[in-house]
């Protein structure tokens, strides 16, 4: 899938997107949840994911990289989406919760619910992204490794013990 227009531009949240058919020229090219996007112009990644890709799991909690609700996996590494620009994503692959397999969604939903790790739920997509990033590289992490993987996520409701329990359960 290419996001863009062949004959005109559409403006979305401060950046331009062109739909190119048959491999037209674009400035940046990257994948979001295994769909190819070609983008001309620049802007922040977070509004692109929410407004263009309709990835609503990517939350805008602070817009300055402090809270972690906007975490996505970029080439398998957890990254906050509110900081990087589209140009920084050129040639990369971005994964949001919407791009998880059905089995992964079921696993994380079960683990976080069973551990009682969810209250308001606002932080959970970012926590789950960081969990997947950790477990993809280390399927049997220690408690310290879990804490390190979740260190850039803020939860104002449950604290972190139940969230860490959920990660252990998912492993």
Regions found by a protein language model. Name each.
Residues 4, 9-26:
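Short, Lys/Arg-enriched N-terminal segments with co-localized hydrophobic residues
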Residues 18-171:
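Signature of N-terminal electron-transfer/Fe-S-associated modules in redox systems
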């Amino acid at each position: 899938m290419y996001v863009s227009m062949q004959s005109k531009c559409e403006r979305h949240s401060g950046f331009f997107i062109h739909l190119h058919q048959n491999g037209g020229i674009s400035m940046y090219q990257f994948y979001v949840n295994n769909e190819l996007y070609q983008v001309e112009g620049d802007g922040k990644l977070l509004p692109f994911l929410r407004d263009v890709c309709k990835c609503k799991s990517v939350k805008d909690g602070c817009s300055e990289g402090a809270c972690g609700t906007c975490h996505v996996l970029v080439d398998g590494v957890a990254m906050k989406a509110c900081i990087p620009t589209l140009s920084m994503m050129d040639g990369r692959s971005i994964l949001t919760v919407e791009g998880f397999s059905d089995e992964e969604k079921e696993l994380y939903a079960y683990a976080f619910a069973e551990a009682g790790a969810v209250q308001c739920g606002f932080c959970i997509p970012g926590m789950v992204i960081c969990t997947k990033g950790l477990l993809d590289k280390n399927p049997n992490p220690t408690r310290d490794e879990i804490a390190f993987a979740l260190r850039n996520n803020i939860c104002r409701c449950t604290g972190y013990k139940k969230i860490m329990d959920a990660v252990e359960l998912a492993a």
